């Protein structure tokens, strides 16, 4: 099952306690303190693995605990540090923290998943392969009694306990990274278009809501240029209110630099102009920033439309919107070369460089 939204409870390891010990060797029956420090608790770390495509591996393991540090030992020996817990996530994950003022200790402390629209505290974002984010930092090890010796107290009989590791409950939200995002009504031919132009193989069928999860494919041009495209489940009017399936996946086109509106020209009951404005309206209700993205419009299924009808639809669309659509047939591969060249030209002229990010982000404070 495709999963792009999960809740986890993470807890870093506790630092090991310091040791109370005194040197007892031959010829030194009353040696001084030699208790070692405790080891540091393990961190909980998120790391991007480009081979992963969703977050389903967290569904049955929402509780993630790093190893505790070991206590110190005599002869000034430091306890072993706890092992870090590395959690792999796909590129494009956004990390939110729930109730940062609360300390979590067990699964009984789990909070309910917030409803869509509730404000969340964003603490990190993982985009590039290999990027790491310290979700919870392990506690420091306690000092052994050797650290407390002084001229006044040469035989301290006390030590420090290790610090508790950081803990928290987090939401991981996947936003697919794709250069181009396809938007359209159910059964408009988005999946067929994706199959035609990329290496992706989404399911296609002559009924609505065939696409139940986002699909990403790569367009390979003859000169070696590559461009990624994403197809999400179709939108319907009222999608911003939770109707249909598309609303839950609109996050997957937020990072796209170019949007492609796919219109079905073959359906006699659909007005292409009205469909276009419906799609724009749903994007605006979800996130106004999506309307600022550059876009192309394609009129699909022209193989099922008579030439005079296609010409009329094209002129009418231009007259009422001031815009034009590219006529294509995703099924018959008509107009695909022009479509891809237009996508590439628009993408190259409008894409923004993603700022470089450090490989390891700062831990929670």
UniProtKB/Swiss-Prot annotation:
It is an enzyme of class 3 (hydrolase). GO terms for cellular component: cytoplasm. Its main location: cytoplasm. It comes from the Bacteria. GO terms for biological process: ribosome biogenesis. It holds the Pfam family GTP1_OBG. InterPro entries: G_OBG, GTP-bd, GTP-bd_Obg/CgtA, GTP1-OBG_CS, GTP1_OBG_dom, GTP1_OBG_dom_sf, OBG_GTPase, P-loop_NTPase. It is found in: Cytoplasm. Residues 64-85 are annotated as: Disordered. Residues 1-177 form the Obg domain. GTP binds at residues 184-191, 209-213, 231-234, 300-303, 329-331. Its cofactor is Mg(2+). PROSITE patterns: G_OBG, GTP1_OBG, OBG. Mg(2+) binds at residues 191, 211. Keywords: Cytoplasm, GTP-binding, Hydrolase, Magnesium, Metal-binding, Nucleotide-binding. GO terms for molecular function: GTP binding; GTPase activity; magnesium ion binding. Its EC number is 3.6.5.-. Residues 178-348 form the OBG-type G domain. SUPFAM superfamilies: Obg GTP-binding protein N-terminal domain, P-loop containing nucleoside triphosphate hydrolases. Gene3D superfamilies: GTP1/OBG domain, P-loop containing nucleotide triphosphate hydrolases. NCBIfam families: PRK12299.1, small_GTP. Monomer. Belongs to the TRAFAC class OBG-HflX-like GTPase superfamily. OBG GTPase family. An essential GTPase which binds GTP, GDP and possibly (p)ppGpp with moderate affinity, with high nucleotide exchange rates and a fairly low GTP hydrolysis rate. Plays a role in control of the cell cycle, stress response, ribosome biogenesis and in those bacteria that undergo differentiation, in morphogenesis control. This is GTPase Obg. It comes from Methylacidiphilum infernorum (isolate V4). The lineage of its organism: Bacteria, Pseudomonadati, Verrucomicrobiota, Methylacidiphilae, Methylacidiphilales.
């Amino acid at each position: 099952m495709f999963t792009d939204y999960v809740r986890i409870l993470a807890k870093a390891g506790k630092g090991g306690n310091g040791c109370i010990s005194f040197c007892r060797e031959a010829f030194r029956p009353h040696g001084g303190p030699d208790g070692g420090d405790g080891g540091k608790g393990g961190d909980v770390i998120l790391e991007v693995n480009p081979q992963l495509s969703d977050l389903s591996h967290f569904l049955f393991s929402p509780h993630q605990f790093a190893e505790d540090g070991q206590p110190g030992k005599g002869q000034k020996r430091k306890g072993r540090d706890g092992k870090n817990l590395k959690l792999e996530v796909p590129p494009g994950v956004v990390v939110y923290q729930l109730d940062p003022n609360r300390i979590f200790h067990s699964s009984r402390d789990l909070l309910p998943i917030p409803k869509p629209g509730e404000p969340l505290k964003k603490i990190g974002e993982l985009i590039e392969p290999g990027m790491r984010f310290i979700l919870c930092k392990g506690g420091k090890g306690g000092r052994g009694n050797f650290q407390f010796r002084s001229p006044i107290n040469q035989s301290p009989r006390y030590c420090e306990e290790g610090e508790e590791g950081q803990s928290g409950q987090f939401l991981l939200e996947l936003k697919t990274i794709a250069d181009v995002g396809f938007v359209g009504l159910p059964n408009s031919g988005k999946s067929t278009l994706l199959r035609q132009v990329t290496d992706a193989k989404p399911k296609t069928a002559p009924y609505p809501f065939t696409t139940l999860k986002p699909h990403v494919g790569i367009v390979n041009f003859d000169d070696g240029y590559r461009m990624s495209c994403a197809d999400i489940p179709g939108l319907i009017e009222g999608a911003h209110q939770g109707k249909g399936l598309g609303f839950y996946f609109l996050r997957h086109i937020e990072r796209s630099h170019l949007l492609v509106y796919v219109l079905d020209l073959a359906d006699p009951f659909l007005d292409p102009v009205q469909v276009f404005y419906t799609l724009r309206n749903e994007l605006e209700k979800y996130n106004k920033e999506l309307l600022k993205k550059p876009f192309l419009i394609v009129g699909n299924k022209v193989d099922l439309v008579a030439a005079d009808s296609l010409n009329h639809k094209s002129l009418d669309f231009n007259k009422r919107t001031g815009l034009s659509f590219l006529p294509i047939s995703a099924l018959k591969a008509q107009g695909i070369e022009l479509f891809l060249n237009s996508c590439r030209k628009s993408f190259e002229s409008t894409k923004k460089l993603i700022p470089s990010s450090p490989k390891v982000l700062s831990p929670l404070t």
